[in-house]
Amino acid sequence: MSRVRVGILGCGMIAQLMHLPYLTELEDRFEIAALCDQDKALAQRVAARHRVPRVHDSWENLLDTVPSLDAVLILNKDHFAPALMALERGIHTFTEKPLCYTQGEAEQLVGTAERTGAKLMVGYMKRYDSGVRRGLEEMRRISAPRMARAHIVVGPDYGNWIIPEIQRIDRPAGAEADSGTDGRTAKARGELGTGSPALLAAYMDMFGVWSHDINVLRAAFPAAPTSVTARVSPDGGTLTALLGHADGLQCVFLGGKTSVRLFEENLTVWGSDRVVELHISNPFLRHVPSTVRVRQDEAPSSGRPRPLTVERTVDGSHHEAFKAQLCHFHACVTTPELQPLTSGQESLEDIRLMLAILRSAR
């Protein structure tokens, strides 16, 4: 099997918890050539644990000096500038979600990937969860979808509290930059045309954890809605949206937070012939499958006054979605005709919908 030589940009929580351990496990597919983080001491400690030979404190330096890179994984907070530089050089590029924070940036990245031929893939790992994939298959079998509801409600720290490893993450020295100091809030303000604290807070959550659910919802119903209305709470921590489609389908999106320690992430579709519920597992619980429930009436039979309702439950496999995602990226890099399931173009369409929701919010 061909090994892909990768550089890692960003050594934070998701890199340490998921990407680096699975890249190391997949050593028959990947060679980690170098790491970079703006906190070089952090990068050196992480590199020592994973036996990575080269460490840099800037992505520019990594891209300029590491020879023969096939691909990069961009795992920092704002992916646009390093992704653009990598794609311009024809380097296959994986970014964590979101791809970027503005529609214009997304269009530029997609256009650059098309021009240079480099693959651009976005880390919506839930699309590589076998339970999610089965749930989407079941939804496509619905003859006439009538209503859908996607909701994500999470407890403290976005549900990350659930695993003890979170306490052992190696942190950078000093205070970490937040969205207000690293430029992301300024980009959000420019897209919205407002400095409303509630909308800016909702923007960060929409482009953060909620973007997974927009992506799954769009996987089920790719067509752009013909009407969008939304409401946001005064603190920006809760947002509801109603999406109307040309065929009569109505979708409700709900994103929110709670102080209760829970993680709820579901997509339910009610159709003319069946109801499909997809219950997505907490991504920080490794090898825990997502679950699909399908309810439908049996065909009528003689001697029965009315059909019976049957419910089927299907659990996904215990194969880890983060690992499956990396295997897919490897396949895309090494197979010229294979395009990413969660491509840059798909992410651009997600961003268009997310912005439509946020701009309609009151």
Q: For the regions a protein language model found, what residue spans apply to each?
A:
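Contiguous beta-strand/loop segments that form the cofactor/metal-binding neighborhood of enzyme cores
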Residues: 198-284, 316-337, 354-357
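Mid-domain beta-loop-alpha active-site segment that forms a flexible
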Residues: 123-130, 160-224
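C-terminal glycine/acidic-rich active-site capping loop/insertion
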Residues: 168-197, 268-341
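A contiguous active-site-proximal alpha/beta segment in oxidoreductase catalytic domains
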Residues: 101-179
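C-terminal helix-rich "cap/oligomerization" subdomain common to oxidoreductases
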Residues: 61, 71, 118, 327-362
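Beta-loop-alpha module in the N-terminal Rossmann-like domain of NAD(P)-dependent dehydrogenases
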Residues: 50-112
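N-terminal Rossmann-like dinucleotide-binding module
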Residues: 1-50
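Hydrophobic residues in well-ordered beta-strands that form the structural core
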Residues: 95-96, 120-122, 278
